[in-house]
Amino acid sequence: EDCLNILGRKGILVHDMHLNRWKTAPLFQRVCSVSYNSFRFWIRLGQWYDGHGFVKEALQCLKLSGKEKEIYSCMIRNYQKVPFSGISFDEVMKWKESIPEVCYLRGMYCYFHQNFEGLNREIIRLNKMDSDEKKKKEIILNLTYVKPDMSLEKWLNLLESYAQKAGTFSLYSMLGNSVTYLCGLRDLSELFACTRKEENRKAHLWRECLGENEYTGYCLARLDYYLEIQQKDAVRDEDWDVIREGTDQDFWQLRLARMYLLCKFQTMKPDEEIAEYIRYLRETLVYEENEWCVRNVDAVDNLFFDRTNKRERFSVWLLHSEDDLRQDLNEDNYLLFFCLAKGFILINQYEKAERIHRKLIPYLQCYRRSYLLAEILFQQAIIYWEGRESSQMLRSMIESFMISGEYRYVRMYIDYGNRGRGVLEAYIEWLRSSRPEGWHRKKKYNYGNVLRMPLEDYMETVLRLAKRETKYVLPLQDHSVEEKLTIMETVILQDLAVGASNAEICKELNLKLPTVKSHIYSLYKKLNVKNRIQAVLKGKELGILK
């Protein structure tokens, strides 16, 4: 143990607090890798990993052995975990067997590749099986849970009918690679956008028919929804308890979902104790071996929490993430694309945000993730408005509120400062002129929450809250010799470092020339320099530029 601690202090090993084990630091992993040719070695190593619960590592070793029988056996034993293990499982599409486990793996493979006809075939195949065992029903529930064209109400009815005979069931994953249970593998807004009586009925059904982990996910989804519709006072104590009672031994997806919700609450009501807990959760997550855990932690940390405290880091995160935009969109990275789109909107880089939207909008429509889609459509409206394309802006706003009109989202519309407020004002003014009958009646303001309001009152409420929100200002956090740069100044400094002219900066950031010159003058003053070369050298000295 002393040797391990010494190697940890030297940076050769890293301690994984969640799994309570040591692993090689990323810097040394390539150096430590050795090539082995014996398939027996890889089988034995894979079996060891499998026996200790490390499914991804087990399959990596067994694939290196080249023995399909061993790969098949491992996947069947761990069929619930394989689709979410972060490793390819395309072998399943070649298998001819029709046992429930194989049907599940094939169905999830089809789901991830948007082959919904293939997903339906596996569900039909399962329903035709003579076996009435609980495993088959549980697999059907998991496959229909991710089926985009199956309503949540219909799925709940299926769950209830199965549970009457077979007891409680498990969902193998609710989150996928999302950070919010409200919009993971399935959008759950429908559970809460209803009367309190109906919500309680669904909550009771969820609790009675599913396990403890699933109810924890339900509570976090409900908390997220009530924060989104600005009803934090209506949040139930048991939902807060799910966050307060968490430990660093919980699986990483749950810890990340907690971190996201705390960051969201922090933007509404800053609290140093919550900020400290967010930092603690981050420390437990950054050493996870799952790449997308670390990437999503970084995105949440920069976009929802640290952008107010570490502006340079926020802009550097955006800059360094641009390479990801060349990748194909999939279940692993769609949330990162969503976060990057929002980040680019916040610093006026509309062209980059729009490139993301071209991929992300059809993807979210395909999987019917209403919660994320409504916000992306609002972002698209902001881009059109800034480009003076009024008709396109109106179309995007209509599409966004067609979703929000049902679920009554609020916060997503008030987080964009003056940009968002201008779009809301223009859209509501257009509605007043085109549909006067709904806007000129006498309003009442004691509905209790947005779910009870007529559509016109709901939209007026969103606009009123957007006006109340001040333009996003990034406060100084310390009093170093050099004043902190704003996000825009940091981005411009990065452009100066690659030799961009003022005209090129104007085009990239969608700014006018006097505005760019003003930012450059301001960053010169803050860095105490007189020209571009000195500014770049100072930026490197301070660590702003890499």
Language-model segments: residues:
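Linker/hinge segments immediately adjacent to helix-turn-helix/homeobox DNA-binding domains
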Residues: 337-373, 377, 386, 394-487, ...
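Structural motif corresponding to the intra-repeat A-B loop/turn of tetratricopeptide repeats
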Residues: 52, 65, 113, 229, ...
